[in-house]
Amino acid sequence: MYLIADWRRTHYSEEVIPEMDGQEVILMGWVHSIRALGKLAFVILRDREGTIQAVVPKQKVDEETFEIAKKLGKEDIIAIRGKVVANEKAPKGFEVIPIEIRVLNKADAPLPLDPSEKVPAEIDTRLDKRFLDIRRPKIQAIFKIRSEMLRSIRKTFADEGFVEVNTPKLVASATEGGTELFPISYFEKEAFLGQSPQLYKQMMMAGGFDKVFEIAQIFRAEEHNTRRHLNEAVSIDTEMSFVNEKDAMAMLEKVVYNCYADIEYNRPQEIELLELNWEIPEKTFDKLTYTEAIDIAISKGVEIEWGEDLSRAAERAVGDEMGGLYFITEWPTQTRPFYTLPHENDNKVCKAFDLMYKELEISSGAQRVHKYDLLVENISNMGMNPDSFETYLEAFKFGMPPHAGWGLGADRFAMVLTAQDNIRECVLFPRDRQRLTP
């Protein structure tokens, strides 16, 4: 068994092409499969980018190399130094003939999970053995697309002049006055894991940053057990000064559109591997009001009254009607947090919006209240004590500009982009009501 020593990978599997005939390469990865047929062995090496075939003919390699090849096991870690040989009959038009094989580490057998995807496994088993599960090419494809999604979003924000910020995740009280918080011991006090950076984003508007964003974890102690909820999630949050809710929606459209375009350009292999029906959306999305959404739901037999939040049945009804990406706007004020700005002509309706994909909510936002007196009134009307929000409210006394923003669920958006029906597929180590390990 060898150390890497002076060897360094020269190529990933997908970088080797037939035109490199005669060139020496060093490959490193896992043994995806091994077939020993008398005086010939076939080793499929798998790395981050794909698989590559090494052919080990006894008459063309030294005895030690051939014996090492024959004794390889699935998922052993190996390094191969060899020559590329063009061969039209080979799977990719070439094969690699090893000069030397180094076994860097052995894998125990039997494997608790088959990374080759030949043996199916339930999602709980896969999540228990996630380190093996993410070796599967299709699982890696999900996370490569997710990575490109986040890279694209950061680039769009940078191009638009946003400042990236990091807000506290240990907080003294609830952001929105709810009780769905995880309490923790904080020295002699009680604290909570943050459920949203909302109040801090708004305070940054008072600080004069104009446009900020954050990509970070949020925590919600909701006792859901569904395919679309987690208790720890990644949220993409933004806030902008001197804008209204329509400007915030336009920015969200730009972020989402750019994600689709960047993924199509930079991750075509992953799109193909996942067999995605990929289509870049229009630059502006369809929009309907909450009232119109309620009318659609009622017309499809859903029992719901104006002023209620949309039930799952209502979301399904509207999603079936709309399809794709669309906004629901002009929500009842009573369904939204205290910092949401009511319409000036009808305070029963507020300047809030949700971005939906079919029946799935992926983003929520609004124009915010920027007047101190109205904010205090809203907090009181919702049965909360303004004194509990003293440090937040202070930012509104000394020059708070009009502002708007939104939060986009990274995990849910990744679900949409990769066409997964369970949010856990898009999170490396998900945290839900039952799962706290690995």
From Swiss-Prot:
SUPFAM superfamilies: Class II aaRS and biotin synthetases, Nucleic acid-binding proteins. The record marks 91 as: Important for tRNA non-discrimination. InterPro entries: Aa-tRNA-synt_II (IPR004364), aa-tRNA-synth_II (IPR006195), aa-tRNA-synth_II/BPL/LPL (IPR045864), Asp-tRNA_synthase_2 (IPR004523), Asp/Asn-tRNA-synth_IIb (IPR002312), NA-bd_OB-fold (IPR012340), NA-bd_OB_tRNA (IPR004365). GO terms for biological process: aspartyl-tRNA aminoacylation. L-aspartate binds at residues 176, 220, 364, 368. Its EC number is 6.1.1.23. It is found in: Cytoplasm. Mg(2+) 2 binds at residues 361, 364. Keywords: Aminoacyl-tRNA synthetase, ATP-binding, Cytoplasm, Ligase, Magnesium, Metal-binding, Nucleotide-binding, Protein biosynthesis. CDD domains: AsxRS_core, ND_PkAspRS_like_N. Residues 198-201 are annotated as: Aspartate. It comes from the Archaea. Its cofactor is Mg(2+). Mg(2+) 3 binds at residue 361. Pfam families: tRNA-synt_2, tRNA_anti-codon. Binds 3 Mg(2+) cations per subunit. The strongest magnesium site (Mg1) is bound to the beta- and gamma-phosphates of ATP and four water molecules complete its coordination sphere. Coiled coil: none annotated. Gene3D superfamilies: Bira Bifunctional Protein, Domain 2, Nucleic acid-binding proteins. The keyword ATP-binding applies. ATP binds at residues 220-222, 228-230, 361, 409-412. GO terms for molecular function: aspartate-tRNA ligase activity; aspartate-tRNA(Asn) ligase activity; ATP binding; magnesium ion binding; RNA binding. Belongs to the class-II aminoacyl-tRNA synthetase family. Type 2 subfamily. Homodimer. Aspartyl-tRNA synthetase with relaxed tRNA specificity since it is able to aspartylate not only its cognate tRNA(Asp) but also tRNA(Asn). Reaction proceeds in two steps: L-aspartate is first activated by ATP to form Asp-AMP and then transferred to the acceptor end of tRNA(Asp/Asn). This is Aspartate--tRNA(Asp/Asn) ligase.
